Amino acid sequence: MKIINILFCLFLLMLNGCNSNDTNTKQTKSRQKRDLTQKEATQEKPKSKSKEDLLREKLSDDQKTQLDWLKTALTGVGKFDKFLENDEGKIKSALEHIKTELDKCNGNDEGKNTFKTTVQGFFSGGNIDNFADQATATCN
């Protein structure tokens, strides 16, 4: 009878040891899952940049200023986003054209407002390829 009791106690100790090992394994697995989700979250952050932010990284300071001006001009729903879908080179040339036209209106706020209205009208249906020809300021 003593031998059976001793064997039974040994069996319980072994069984208890196996269960505690499973707990450690579960904790390790949950820790790995948590680490993976944290890594995924940090990897997703760079992808969340908007088209505007990605474009701004490639623009000069003058071009950024013109982009801000254009953003205030294109107030219609989705018009500025539609503008950002164009090719980067076309966007840069449009921003340079805006700069030259606004420089013509130096100190003439009425001319700048007229040009802003012209730009709004152009982007309501115009193609960016014709922007430099069709959107011009009236001030000299």
UniProtKB/Swiss-Prot annotation:
GO terms for cellular component: cell outer membrane. Keywords: Cell outer membrane, Lipoprotein, Membrane, Palmitate, Plasmid, Signal. Induction: Weakly induced when grown at 35 degrees Celsius. It comes from the Bacteria. Residues 33-57 have a biased composition (Basic and acidic residues). It is found in: Cell outer membrane. Residues 1-17 form the signal peptide. Residues 22-57 are annotated as: Disordered. A lipid is attached at C18 (S-diacylglycerol cysteine). A lipid is attached at C18 (N-palmitoyl cysteine). It holds the Pfam family Mlp. It is a lipid-anchor. Belongs to the Multicopy lipoprotein (Mlp) family. An outer membrane protein that may participate in pathogenesis. Some human Lyme disease patients have antibodies against this protein. The Mlp proteins probably undergo intragenic recombination, generating new alleles. This is Lipoprotein MlpG. The gene is mlpG.
